[in-house]
A protein has these predicted regions:
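Catalytic phosphate/metal-binding cores of nucleic-acid and nucleotide-processing enzymes, i.e., regions
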Residues: 2-102
């Protein structure tokens, strides 16, 4: 799976807005979480080009979460998960979870 890495961090794409998730609503395409081309389109605010790219590269994808995509840079090798509630996604790093022991 291709990933964009800068200064030891990996670009992770997520949709923080309520309504529709991005990777959480498209489990068939796990690579959309890291796709370097999508990262570039988001960073350059090229929404029309992004829409065309996603439609051609990922046929049948649900793209409701494409508006408002964000990039979070996570240290390479870190474990994380993408949580989703009502379409709004957030990224949770394993090292930042405070576990409670019974």
């Amino acid at each position: 799976m291709n990933k964009l890495i800068r200064k030891g961090c990996v670009a992770v794409i997520y949709s923080p807005e309520f309504g529709a998730g991005w990777s959480t609503w498209n489990r068939k395409y796990p690579e959309i979480l890291f796709d370097p081309a999508i990262v570039e389109f988001v960073e350059k605010d090229q929404s029309e080009e992004l829409q065309v790219y996603v439609t051609l590269k990922y046929p049948g994808i649900y793209d409701g979460g494409i508006v408002g995509l964000k990039i979070e840079w996570i240290p390479e090798g870190s474990f994380f998960r993408v949580n989703e509630y009502d379409g709004a996604e957030n990224i949770e790093l394993r090292d930042r979870i405070r576990w409670i022991q019974a």
